[in-house]
Amino acid sequence: MKVIFLKDVKGKGKKGEIKNVADGYANNFLFKQGLAIEATPANIKALEAQKRKEQRQAEEELAKAKQLKEKLEQITVELSAKAGEGGRLFGSITSKQIAEVLQSQHQIKIDKRKIELDDAIRSLGYTNVPVKLHPEVTATLKVHVTEQK
């Protein structure tokens, strides 16, 4: 019997795949557990429509990420912190602080987990910080840390 997998089934098939399986296995396990549906022409059409929709959404997300990348690379985030001699900061600048300043100064909301700061910023001056907007799109954000008076 041909079935369309709704979820990944180890050793049998991945979500969205159409495969031939034993009738008993399909009726007694896959259908009852909600892991698959019968591959009727109507169900196959619905699956193809859903795949097209997901493809369109993925393309839109990629376009939005590229647009945001352009915007972010034009911006310099200005932060001030208390510093000691030689430009060393008391404390550090974290990705959370950078995200908050982006929100307050530029009205751009970015999750702090997308800001890939290997180590917190501990010195004055300019720092280039990578921001992963999409698996294929990474922007570079300029962060300028000045001394707080």
UniProtKB/Swiss-Prot annotation:
GO terms for molecular function: rRNA binding; structural constituent of ribosome. Keywords: Ribonucleoprotein, Ribosomal protein, RNA-binding, rRNA-binding. GO terms for cellular component: ribonucleoprotein complex; ribosome. InterPro entries: Ribosomal_bL9, Ribosomal_bL9/RNase_H1_N, Ribosomal_bL9_bac/chp, Ribosomal_bL9_C, Ribosomal_bL9_C_sf, Ribosomal_bL9_N, Ribosomal_bL9_N_sf. Pfam families: Ribosomal_L9_C (PF03948), Ribosomal_L9_N (PF01281). GO terms for biological process: translation. It comes from the Bacteria. Belongs to the bacterial ribosomal protein bL9 family. Binds to the 23S rRNA. PANTHER family: 50S RIBOSOMAL PROTEIN L9. NCBIfam families: L9 (TIGR00158). This is Large ribosomal subunit protein bL9.
